[in-house]
């Protein structure tokens, strides 16, 4: 068995007049993340980890922030495409262990919904996904 591990990291600035998307779900909060896409930092970090584990560069290479087709795109679409890319190379997902670093909003009430959303998009069981907030 060939086990590969990837690491993903993403940061976006919180700003007014944007929706806050994390883990594929919209979270009710007065600020949102600034970005070319919906700026879902959790999904972007997961994409980077998957692509890195498969030695396939990073999210910016496959889905550049200069491309019209990625403007305001739902990051769940990028995650699904990333899963398709790694599957085409013969890789399957073992598990995801992710930590979101944010003082606000409190994310623990949303973790179950994020896990369910990500599992559905990725075609895996929820018990293959761990999300922590600090």
Predicted regions and their residues:
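RNase III-family endoribonuclease catalytic core
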Residues: 2-114, 121-122
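Pyridoxal 5′-phosphate
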Residues: 131-132
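Short acidic capping loops at alpha-helix termini that bridge into adjacent secondary structure
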Residues: 125-128
């Amino acid at each position: 068995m060939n086990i590969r591990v990837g690491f993903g990291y993403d940061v976006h600035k919180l700003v007014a007049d944007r929706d806050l998307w994390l883990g594929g779900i919209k979270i009710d909060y007065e600020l949102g993340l600034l970005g070319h896409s919906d700026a879902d930092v959790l999904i972007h970090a997961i994409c980077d980890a998957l692509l890195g584990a498969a030695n396939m560069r990073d999210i910016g290479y496959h889905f550049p922030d200069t491309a019209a087709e990625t403007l305001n795109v739902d990051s769940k679409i990028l995650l699904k495409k990333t899963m398709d890319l790694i599957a085409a190379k013969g890789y399957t997902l073992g598990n995801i262990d992710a930590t979101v670093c944010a003082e606000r909003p409190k994310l623990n009430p949303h973790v179950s919904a994020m896990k369910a959303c990500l599992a559905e998009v990725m075609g895996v069981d929820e018990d293959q996904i761990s999300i922590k907030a600090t």
